[in-house]
Amino acid sequence: MPDETMPGGRPSHVVVIGAGWAGWGAAKALCEAGIRVTLIDGMPDPTGSQPITTKSGKPFEAGTRGFWKDYPNINALTDELGAGDIFTDFTTSAFWSPDGLEATAPVFGETPQWPSPLGQMVATFTNFTRLPIQDRLSIAGLLYAMLDLYRSDKIFQQYDDLDAQSLFVKLGISDRLINEFLHPTVLVGLFKPPEELSAAVTMELLYYYALAHQDSFDVRWIKSKSIAEHLFAPLSRRLISRHHLQVMGGTLVRRVKVSPDSLRVSSVELMNVETKSVQVIEDVDAVVMAVGAKGLKSLMAQSPELSKAAPELVGAASLGSIDVVSARLWLDRYVPIAYPANVFSRFESLKGSGGTFFMLDQLHKDAQQALWGNEQPQGSVVASDFYNASAIAAMSDQEIIDRLTRDLLPASHRPSRIQQCQGC
């Protein structure tokens, strides 16, 4: 972190690349520390002031994000911005397979409070509709492994060297519990199947979201408009007006130049997405790279001095990236889906991806008109996200729509296929 002022009395200047959660978080912290900040992103309007819309004028947001109960930073931000009542109540989530309803995740805060994990076990005892109790009890070995994880650095490394699928099998977890619950949970939580994930990282996810505290898994959602409009837009206005934040949308960073003598950032080269014009910011003291591996790889390839000075960034840029596909459907009738937040499980048509879908007409029940833009509301609005979605991304828009409407979504609208498990 540079000093607040540089020699000569000018304020330190930091360029933040990327206007996602990480980029806005960095910009906020730096601005409030008295540092001049330029925030750069390829989106035309990273501030959220201009909502993203489809060609027909309907609102769209890339991905549906949940807000867990243990998000004190988000709660503090909404209070600080005076955002008001922007969230739904905490909601039940459901898991659906080709056989119908598999399980539901209750609102744990509404159940009797017991020490973890006893409280979670009691609260979910009747929430699996098809999975026999003997399969559910097979998860006991995983609870021991999670307690063992931090016993020493050596033990942690052993788990980190093992993939999660191998750990599940080694611990004797039943195939049904793995395939029908753990596998889809991990796919939508860490965006990769368990055979491609570190066992240590997977256990950290499960601990934080499900076992740390009984109600840590409780989740709620934005109940109108979008996250960008409710949070990023007021945050950007505050940082611009109070701290003179400069936001450059529709702009890509082509190169970060580093002085070979001092190994300090000397300039940042930019390109306008629309005009292809190039400009250089000379008075840069530091750069925050709030970008993914794909963007970082491109940037490092064009920044030889930086690559030489920071080989760890080259290593980070070599990591794989994850394809995510988001779709939103406006239906011509209301579909009575039992739960607003849902996870797909065991569908062959997912082609190895994880999938979720959300009934926005239920989550935004008091803001129906806003979901339809300038049109009269006609029916349900469904938002669906696919993770680890390379195969889905290669499909046409119509193919994705057909998979949702003909295969995936109908499974959650066939009550006759929801069977209560005998002996559960």
Language-model-detected regions and their locations in the chain:
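Glycine-rich FAD pyrophosphate-binding loop
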Residues: 31-54
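Mid-domain catalytic core of redox enzymes
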Residues: 9, 33, 222-223, 251-382, ...
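Active-site/ligand-binding neighborhood in enzyme catalytic cores
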Residues: 141-264, 273
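Extreme N-terminal leader/targeting segments of oxidoreductases
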Residues: 1-14, 32-33, 54
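Mobile amphipathic helical/loop "lid" adjacent to a hydrophobic cofactor/ligand pocket
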Residues: 75, 79-80, 84-199
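N-terminal Rossmann-like FAD-binding beta1-loop-alpha1 element of flavoenzymes
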Residues: 11-39
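N-terminal glycine-rich dinucleotide-binding loop that anchors FAD/FMN and/or NAD(P) in oxidoreductases
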Residues: 52-77
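Flavin (FAD/FMN) cofactor-binding core of flavoprotein oxidoreductases
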Residues: 187-190, 409-424
